[in-house]
Design a protein with these regions (language model features):
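Acidic, low-complexity intrinsically disordered segments
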Residues: 1-202
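Radical SAM enzyme core and accessory elements
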Residues: 2-8, 40-43, 103, 123, ...
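Flexible glycine/acidic-rich beta-alpha junction loops that bind and position SAM and/or redox cofactors
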Residues: 8-14, 96-99, 219, 271-276, ...
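Alpha-helical structural signal in soluble globular domains
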Residues: 34, 38, 78, 82, ...
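Short, electropositive alpha-helical surface patch
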Residues: 52, 57-66, 222-228, 293, ...
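Structural detector of well-ordered beta-strand residues that form the stable sheet scaffold
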Residues: 87-88, 108, 131-132, 236-238, ...
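Structural recognition of alpha->loop->beta junctions
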Residues: 99-118, 201, 252-262, 318-333
Length: 428
């Protein structure tokens, strides 16, 4: 039997669709890992390669985030019109299974590791069900190593992606992670992770941990980082800003090869942080916190959500000044996006403030709700100005002109974001 896994592309002309550096979908490699060996599994990434709708694959499997969902449905229609069976999973489908079922033959709701073998067995016997939802999560100790061989020959910047934990103990209003995983924070055994890392470094010393919060449990993270010390790895992941308060853990991360962290500052307004549910973020300490990262050789890709009720047009120059004064190596400025399943969507729906459910525009670059502190035009123009200004050469010089070991990552990252923003503006 043959299976074709497809990662749908982002809408063209959007920032995330224009970035030249791309990472593979680890979730598809994880699904491949729980696929029985009698299946021949291949991958197609719609972002940069054509889809063969006349493939001889027996089963087509898609995953999608919300802005990719319309493209995923288009792809599904192309295959179903040729008599192929199409199944789909991912964050968007898990929150809107009925919508997906009008476009595909079956959906996987939630984590697919447990139910995937059963779905395949049902397909082979002609008894495919419409919805597959696990009764319990797979033990993290039982999750097999992702089948990264499906990435071979693809145009990816890095295929050394790995997941050590699932979930997040926090419950931020705008975040999809809790809606998908719940508030459980589950961890793979440290020994398993270290063994997998030993294999990964044979291909490349750079590793990206896709964990949503790799330091949520210091009793887990500390021995992990200590075990990684001396491996010669250079790695990136996600951590909250209050990671800076744990100097021992941060020092261990730096010594183990951490070059950078995606850090959700989210807002400079403490009232907005409280509304978001960012219970550990303290805006008054952000500057010192950023310095603590730098002191340990760890660069920051900061994230600041634009459009919360406390934001006014003054937020844009204020954010630029902060980012430059804090010398953040890189940053993104996503527009508040009320994704299906999130608490912020439920709140904005109750307030009658959702103005669009065109999923293509749920890309963190378009406004889909009525803001309070400014007009839609002011928010959109402020977003565009902030991105252009932050990734201008003068700003890049002010932020990263001093040599720092993380420049090997953040130098190219800044140039990549700058080029993508310019391509987006020119309509390339």
């Amino acid at each position: 039997m043959k299976m074709l896994l497809i990662s749908p592309g982002w809408p063209k002309g959007r920032l995330w669709g224009e970035l030249a550096f791309r990472f593979p979908s680890l979730s598809l490699a994880a699904i491949a890992a729980v696929t029985p060996p009698e299946w021949d599994v291949t991958l197609c990434d719609d972002s940069f390669e054509p889809i063969n709708f006349d493939t001889d694959a027996d089963l087509i499997a898609l995953t999608a985030m919300t802005p990719q969902a319309p493209r995923a449905y288009e792809i599904a229609a192309g295959f179903r019109s040729r008599g192929k069976t199409v199944v789909m999973g991912g964050f968007h489908v898990s929150n809107l299974p009925d919508e997906a079922l009008s476009n595909v033959d079956a959906v996987v709701v939630g984590e697919g590791d447990v139910v995937w073998p059963r779905l395949l067995a049902d397909f082979c016997t002609g008894n495919l069900q419409r919805i597959y939802k696990p009764d319990a999560m797979m033990s993290m100790a039982d999750i097999p190593v992702a089948r990264r061989e499906i990435f071979k020959g693809k145009d990816y910047l890095l295929t050394n992606t790995i997941q050590t934990t699932r979930g997040c103990p926090f419950d931020c209003e705008f975040c999809s992670v809790t809606a998908f995983y719940g508030r459980n924070y589950r961890k793979r055994p440290v020994e398993q992770v270290l063994s997998e890392l030993q294999g990964l470094k044979k291909a490349n010393s750079f590793v990206f941990f896709v964990d949503d919060n790799i330091v949520a449990d210091r009793k887990y993270a500390l021995p992990l980082f200590q075990g990684m010390k001396g491996m010669g790895l250079k790695w990136l992941s996600h951590a909250p800003i209050d990671f800076a308060a744990d100097r021992e853990l941060m020092h261990a991360a730096g010594e183990s090869g951490c070059l950078g962290m995606f850090v959700g500052f989210e807002s400079l307004n403490q009232e907005s942080l409280s509304a978001m549910g960012k219970v550990t973020n303290r805006a008054q300490s952000f500057m010192a916190d950023a310095q603590a990262f730098r002191d340990n050789g760890i660069g920051i890709l900061g994230s600041f959500v634009l459009g919360y009720d406390g934001d006014t047009p003054e937020i844009f120059p204020k954010l630029l000044r902060f980012c430059e004064d804090a010398r953040l190596e890189a940053a993104i400025f996503p527009l508040l996006t009320p994704y299906p399943g999130t608490a912020v969507r439920r709140r904005l729906e109750a307030e009658g403030r959702i103005i669009s459910s065109n999923w293509r525009d749920y890309d963190m670059e378009h406004i889909n709700f009525q803001p309070k502190g400014m007009t839609i035009q002011q928010l959109q123009e402020g977003y565009d100005w902030l991105n252009r200004s932050f990734y201008s050469f003068p700003s890049m010089y002010r932020r990263i002109f001093k040599l720092h070991r993380s420049v090997q990552v953040f130098g190219p990252m800044n140039l990549g974001f700058r080029a993508a923003i310019r391509r987006k503006r020119s309509g390339a």
